[in-house]
């Protein structure tokens, strides 16, 4: 083949490849342009959607307590926050806002349980010209006192012993000693009859009006921190899945708890630091709290609470600081203004008294909550009357709830 023919063939091949490359580049350019168009369209859609008015809020519900209402609702599309409106029958006012689209609950802290309040929630979009969407259907918060406890028996025990131990009638009455089988029968009654035993934290929330519990609710407490409460009562509380609290005398807690040998009548029969830590770790429903560090001694014939200055009481509190106590039961059930002020300043949440023996009401002073003593001579019928809330001798005539019933 001549050189001219070879050159012509090569030229034709070169032109063919050139055309192929041009088509390939054109296809690539078209693909890039197509992607750009799609991306631009998506961006337009995103921008359009981000500027859209939020959808109507749905699923609004109100969980109503004595002094607060917690609202919950479903997340609304195109909303980046929410605004809450409240109407108490006279006017609608802005009650609050959420911080983000995922914040689909809000709590109204100033609720008056005597007044029905209606709420609505609207979604907001900070990028939209029309910032608020259509509000939710209204929901009305109504407090139904018949569904919840309005007074709670707080039972006060002291020493718990086994059935084999000999205890005089006077000891059961004045020493408030109760036998194991008697305590178990009481716990079994509560369990079998649908009672709720509250922790101190739960009672605190109830007292503040922030939580509700069934009418059949009770709190069970033990004073002095005798080790029989740990060895005898504590296993029963775990057996029946009950909550309880022990108020320990700080000076008696140093060291390790002794073996249970009540027949020796040893003086050092108290719950110790190791037992306090163990119970807190394995069964938090059984609280260990303060009965002061060392304020049971009477001075000059006065009751302990009236015998000490503010500084003396504060020093006693500081000695108990390593335990992290936040609740206290007053020695002998009595207290002074000095003592109440110290507890507030020391960061305690609540304190319990025995003066007088009434059911606990929300109207009780947070640092003078009433309790009812239970002794070894309290019959089962008496116990049932007390925990039912129907024993009239323990109704506080000064409590608002009782005053309303008397009218």
What do the predicted segments below correspond to?
Residues 150-162, 167-168, 172-177, 214-218, ...:
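Metal-dependent polysaccharide deacetylase catalytic core of the NodB/CE4 family, i.e.
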Residues 1-25:
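N-terminal Lys/Arg-rich, disordered targeting/topogenic segments
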Residues 98-106, 136:
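Short, solvent-exposed loop/turn segments in extracellular or other extracytoplasmic domains
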Residues 52-53, 125-146:
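Extracellular fibronectin type III
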Residues 78-96:
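Extracellular low-complexity, O-glycosylation-prone stalks/linkers
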Residues 139-218, 371, 375-382, 386-407:
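N-terminal pre-catalytic segment of deacetylase/amide-hydrolase enzymes
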Residues 106-131:
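Beta-strand-rich modules
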Residues 67-79:
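Conserved aromatic anchor
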């Amino acid at each position: 083949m001549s050189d001219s023919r070879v050159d012509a063939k090569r030229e034709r091949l070169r032109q063919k490849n050139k055309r192929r490359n041009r088509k390939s580049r054109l296809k690539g350019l078209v693909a890039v342009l197509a992607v750009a168009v799609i991306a631009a369209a998506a961006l337009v859609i995103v921008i359009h959607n981000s500027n859209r008015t939020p959808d109507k809020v749905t699923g609004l519900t109100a969980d109503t307590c004595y002094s607060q209402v917690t609202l919950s609702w479903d997340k609304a599309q195109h909303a980046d926050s929410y605004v809450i409106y409240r109407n108490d029958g006279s006017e609608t006012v802005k009650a609050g806002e959420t911080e983000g689209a995922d914040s689909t609950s809000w709590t109204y802290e100033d609720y008056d349980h005597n007044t029905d309040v209606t709420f609505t929630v609207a979604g907001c979009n900070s990028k939209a010209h029309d910032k608020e969407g259509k509000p939710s259907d209204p929901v009305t918060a109504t407090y139904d006192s018949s569904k919840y406890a309005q007074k709670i028996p707080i039972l006060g025990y002291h020493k718990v012993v086994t059935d084999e131990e000999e205890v005089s009638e006077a000891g059961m009455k004045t020493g408030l000693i109760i036998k194991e089988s008697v305590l178990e029968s009481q716990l079994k009654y509560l369990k079998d009859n649908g009672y709720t035993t509250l922790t101190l934290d739960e009672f605190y929330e109830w007292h503040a009006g922030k939580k509700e519990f069934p009418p059949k609710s009770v709190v069970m407490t033990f004073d002095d921190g005798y080790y029989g409460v740990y060895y005898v009562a504590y296993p029963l509380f775990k057996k029946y899945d009950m909550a309880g609290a022990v108020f320990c005398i700080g000076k008696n807690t140093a060291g390790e708890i002794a073996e249970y040998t009540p027949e020796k009548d040893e003086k050092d029969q108290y719950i110790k630091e190791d037992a306090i830590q163990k119970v807190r770790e394995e069964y938090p429903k059984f609280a260990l709290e303060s009965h002061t560090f060392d304020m049971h001694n009477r001075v000059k014939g006065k009751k302990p609470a009236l015998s000490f200055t503010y500084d003396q009481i504060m020093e006693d509190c500081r000695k108990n600081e390593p335990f992290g106590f936040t609740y206290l039961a007053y020695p002998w059930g009595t207290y002074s203004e000095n003592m109440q002020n110290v507890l507030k300043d020391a960061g305690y949440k609540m304190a319990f008294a025995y003066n007088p023996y009434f059911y606990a009401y929300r109207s009780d002073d947070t640092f003078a909550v009433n309790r009812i003593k239970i002794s070894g001579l309290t019959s089962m019928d008496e116990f049932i009357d007390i925990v039912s809330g129907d024993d009239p001798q323990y109704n506080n005539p000064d409590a608002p709830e009782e005053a309303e019933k008397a009218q």
